[in-house]
A protein has these predicted regions:
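Transmembrane alpha-helix boundary signature
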Residues: 20-23, 54-55, 73-96, 105-123, ...
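Transmembrane helical segments that form the transport core of multi-pass membrane transport proteins
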Residues: 259-343
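Hydrophobic transmembrane alpha-helices that form the pore/transport pathway of multi-pass ion
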Residues: 125-179
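Interfacial loop-to-helix junctions that mark the boundaries of transmembrane helices
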Residues: 24-35, 56-65, 86-99, 200-210, ...
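Juxtamembrane and boundary regions of transmembrane helices in multi-pass small-molecule transporters
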Residues: 56, 163, 182-183, 192, ...
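Cytoplasmic-side transmembrane-helix entry/capping segments in multi-pass membrane proteins
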Residues: 6, 58-70, 94, 98, ...
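Juxtamembrane interface elements at the cytosolic ends of transmembrane helices
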Residues: 42-53, 110, 145, 149, ...
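N-terminal secretory/membrane targeting signals
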Residues: 1-23
Length: 343
């Protein structure tokens, strides 16, 4: 039986062996649609199971995602060979998954270090303004970062209202989805395109009219709905003492500087063309991308070190959402290997 050190040496040898890369070529045109079933299964599980069997999903989503990943990886290894499976696994890990998770973590940490304080009243005008601001911010700090920054202020502003479900639903539509369409920072598929060589400003140059149209229509629908709902609210007694009013402001302002650093690091990795490339099991890792990822880790550490505990407590900052996202996207990135090859 191999000792642990021998297994480690074997694993490291495979990890840094570029020669197996030739086994990783996949002819996407010859693949059947059956190879896309695990990918569809992951997406359907994420969409349906939290609604149908929420307790099962909450406690076992990691196992379910792992099951779909293995449903792809094991047949892949059997059909194309272990070397091909290994090389594609390393490529998905180093070229796509790790950069994505590191960027998302940095944006999540930086956004979690900014707290918007102040007394807000959830009128249709204010709610619409918050959603519009969130739509803009989502393309620069990610849909996750913008959502984390603004969801609590808008919930606080509407806390006295008897019905605010539509506010959260439109928040998800506008801030958590449509708003992140203009830069690679906004949405995972756009960031993957950026990693593949798509220019940083391509989406802004080509789809800003479509994004503007979609966001304006959604904001208009929301304003009409929210105005109707607001007028049906029972009258609230105006017994708020002057001392209870708090001026609008920000805690953790240094994180805005760190947010600018995140944008600069991503831009740097796309602009700087370095000849220095590290070959890891057939996956080329360029120096700009490596420095970007290391820089993002440093930014996240600085944010955690400089942000007061009071701000994190006020934001109810925790790691569970990031752990969940990391597990889910691990399955997504693995099961998309064949789907991307077919495309």
């Amino acid at each position: 039986m191999l000792k642990k050190t021998q297994w480690l040496a074997l694993l490291m040898g495979l990890f840094f062996l570029p020669g197996v890369a030739s086994a990783a070529d996949i002819d996407g045109a010859s693949l059947s649609l059956a190879w896309g079933v695990p990918f569809a299964g992951v997406l359907l599980s994420i969409a349906v199971m939290p609604l149908v069997v929420p307790n099962v999903w909450h406690h076992h989503f990691g196992k379910i995602t792992t099951g779909w990943a293995l449903a792809f990886l094991l047949p892949f290894a059997f059909y194309f060979g272990i070397h091909a499976a290994w090389v594609n696994f390393i490529h998905a890990l180093l070229a796509e998954y790790m950069p994505f998770v590191i960027l998302l973590t940095a944006l999540y940490v930086v956004a979690g270090g900014i707290y918007i304080r102040g007394s807000l009243r959830g009128t249709p005008v204010l709610n619409t303004a918050i959603l519009a601001i969130g739509a803009v911010l989502a393309s620069f700090m990610g849909t996750t970062g913008a959502s984390m920054l603004l969801i609590r202020p808008i919930i606080r502003a509407n806390a006295q209202r008897s019905s605010m479900t539509h506010v959260v639903v439109f928040f998800i539509f506008i801030v958590s989805n449509a708003g992140g369409s203009l830069t690679p920072l906004g949405d995972p598929p756009l960031f993957l395109g950026f990693l593949k060589g798509v220019p940083f400003t391509w989406t802004f140059q080509h789809i800003w009219p479509d994004t503007l149209f979609l966001v304006v229509v959604l904001l208009g629908l929301f304003f009409v709905w929210d105005t109707w709902a607001y007028r049906r609210e029972p009258a609230q007694p105006a017994k708020v003492e002057a001392a209870e009013h708090e001026r609008l402001g920000f805690d953790g302002k240094f994180n805005f500087v760190l947010l600018a650093a995140v944008v600069a690091l991503v831009l740097m990795s796309g602009i700087w063309q370095s000849p220095v490339v590290f070959d890891i099991a057939g996956t080329e890792v360029g120096l700009p991308g490596l420095l970007r990822d290391l820089g993002l880790v440093v930014v996240a550490v600085i944010s955690l070190a400089t942000t007061s505990h009071r701000v994190h407590t006020a934001n109810q900052f925790g790691w569970d959402p990031m752990f969940e996202v990391a597990k889910l996207f691990a399955g997504i990135f693995l099961t998309t290997i064949h789907v991307i090859a077919m495309l």
